[in-house]
Amino acid sequence: MRAAGTRAEGVLLAPYTTLRLGGPAKAFAEADTAHELVRLVAEADRAGEPVLVLGGGSNLVVADEGFDGLVVRVAATGVSVVADGDRMLVTAEAGEDWDALVRRCVTEGWSGVECLSGIPGLVGSTPIQNVGAYGQDVSQTIAGVRS
């Protein structure tokens, strides 16, 4: 395992996609914090290097030729919970596994996302894709998104 934020060359992307497809990235890095993600993307932008921000790798097909630029995998994790009267405010980092978060909410008895179990991906991509199933979608429960 490489240190967060350090670049590696030629990392195969197949292990990072749910379809297990994908050739090498010209450069690959993992961002363990939002600050690290911003830094890596900003550096690549300044250098004119193409950037792919990678979450859980679902809904993503990478060619056998790979990606001719920097792939930054979102790896920031952490969940905090604050009670607000009879409501719970759950804050999750973008790199948290979505289904694991749903399982925790169900286990704790927090309603609102229970129908969204089994959907692959990370927390950070769920609002972008407006994940939904069985008449429930994340737009009904998200109070805010930090970008």
Question: What would you call each of these model-derived segments?
Answer:
Residues M1-S147:
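Anion-binding (especially nucleotide phosphate/pyrophosphate-binding) glycine-rich loop
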